[in-house]
From Swiss-Prot:
The keyword Glycosyltransferase does not apply. It holds the Pfam family TRM. One of its GO terms (biological process) is tRNA N2-guanine methylation. It catalyses: guanosine(26) in tRNA + 2 S-adenosyl-L-methionine = N(2)-dimethylguanosine(26) in tRNA + 2 S-adenosyl-L-homocysteine + 2 H(+). Dimethylates a single guanine residue at position 26 of a number of tRNAs using S-adenosyl-L-methionine as donor of the methyl groups. PANTHER family: N 2 ,N 2 -DIMETHYLGUANOSINE TRNA METHYLTRANSFERASE, TRNA (GUANINE(26)-N(2))-DIMETHYLTRANSFERASE. The gene is trm1. This is tRNA (guanine(26)-N(2))-dimethyltransferase. It comes from Pyrobaculum islandicum (strain DSM 4184 / JCM 9189 / GEO3). Its EC number is 2.1.1.216. GO terms for molecular function: tRNA (guanine(26)-N2)-dimethyltransferase activity; tRNA binding. Belongs to the class I-like SAM-binding methyltransferase superfamily. Trm1 family.
């Protein structure tokens, strides 16, 4: 395997030479440079969470995520890296040595390792290629009470309902077509994590959830206890949509999507702390504002167009605030906004 030296954040590390392989997917060890933002944001989150943490990344690839955690967050006490590929394991060891980082490296099936680590991890980060569904039960079993579960899903087309049968088979949910389909996909993922957590007697409290062009990501505090798990399930429901109107309902019909997480997607205080490090601050400030709005959907400007024309997003937000409606832009759509109001209230103000 031909290697080159790469740099991400504060870490130098070896990766398979991209000039040697047709794509990152054909390389013997997987490294996705487009996930750098994901890893950087995860480092910021860990900085706010604690210190001396036992962190497990069961799908490590080159090991860059775990190594960045160890070097940049100052929060890691024990680092556990794993990959089912022997070539990946050798590369992980090489990268740990290059950076002077101590870590335990395993060559196991991810689920097997997570079962062996039962109740020992403060942080479990599931970052697969594709769906995280096959790993979540074992991830919760490895987690300690009040641990942090982090989950990435790159099967976004499935989560937003583009492939209905696969969505139902994989996530046991039904997603209808709506203008706010990105938020439905994100809430679909968080809802699935919550249901798996409850089956393992955990509740979840999302602290940081978002969408990027090719993936969904959620990180949540997990609290052990049957009663807590039952309470967590109260945050599940269905979102009904018809002719621009939206509402939360408790049953599935031809106009509703779910089951979905209808509670908060994140903690504004946590994201505010993350934004203080000066990295991706504008993005994090947008999330902070979004998390403060309870409505589990967003609106898009074309929904309020008259004769094919609608005001700019900035003007729309200004008009709504003047009308006494709390509203903010969303990171999930370039022409979208979230508001503590229904469609008719917004349309009335914009038509004045």
């Amino acid at each position: 395997m031909k290697l080159i030296l790469n740099k991400e954040g504060a870490v130098e590390f070896y990766i398979p030479d991209p000039q040697t392989y047709r794509s990152i997917y054909s390389a013997p060890v997987f490294y996705n440079p487009s996930m750098e933002k994901n890893r950087t944001l995860s480092v910021l989150l860990l900085k706010t969470y604690g210190s001396g943490l036992t962190v497990c990344e069961p799908l490590s690839g080159t090991g860059i995520r775990g190594i960045r955690y160890a070097i940049e967050s100052n929060a890691v006490g024990r680092l556990i890296l794993n990959d089912i590929s022997k070539e990946a394991v050798e590369l992980i060891k090489k990268n740990l040595e290059l950076n002077g980082v101590e870590g335990e490296v395993y060559n196991e099936d991810a689920n097997v390792l997570l079962h062996k680590l039962r109740n020992t991890c403060d942080v479990v980060d599931i970052d697969p290629f594709g769906s995280p569904a096959p790993f979540l039960h074992a991830a919760f079993r490895a987690l300690r009470d009040e641990g942090l579960i982090c989950v990435t899903a790159t099967d976004t087309a499935v989560l937003v309902g583009r492939y209905p049968r696969k969505c139902f088979r994989r996530y046991n949910s039904v997603i209808r077509r709506t203008p706010f389909y990105i938020e439905l996909g994100l809430r679909n993922l968080v809802g699935y994590v919550a249901r798996v957590a409850a089956s393992e007697d955990f509740s979840i409290q999302p602290v940081f959830s978002y969408w990027e062009n090719h993936y969904f990501r959620t990180c949540a505090l997990a609290t052990r206890g049957a009663r807590e798990a039952d309470d967590s399930l109260n945050n599940l429901g269905y979102i009904w949509y018809l002719k621009k109107r939206r509402k939360i309902v408790q049953t599935l019909d031809e106009h509703s999507s779910g089951p979905l997480w209808i509670g908060p997607l994140g903690d504004p205080l946590v994201v505010h702390k993350m934004s203080q490090y000066g990295v991706y601050s504008v993005f994090l400030q947008t999330l902070e504002m979004e998390y403060s709005i309870q409505a589990p959907w967003y609106f898009r400007l074309p929904e309020f167009a008259v004769d094919g024309k609608s005001p700019t997003l900035e003007k729309t937000l200004e008009l709504l605030r003047r009308g006494g409606i709390y509203a903010t832009r969303t990171h999930m759509s370039y022409d979208g906004f979230k508001a503590e109001a229904n469609y008719d209230e917004i349309a009335r103000i914009l038509s004045i």
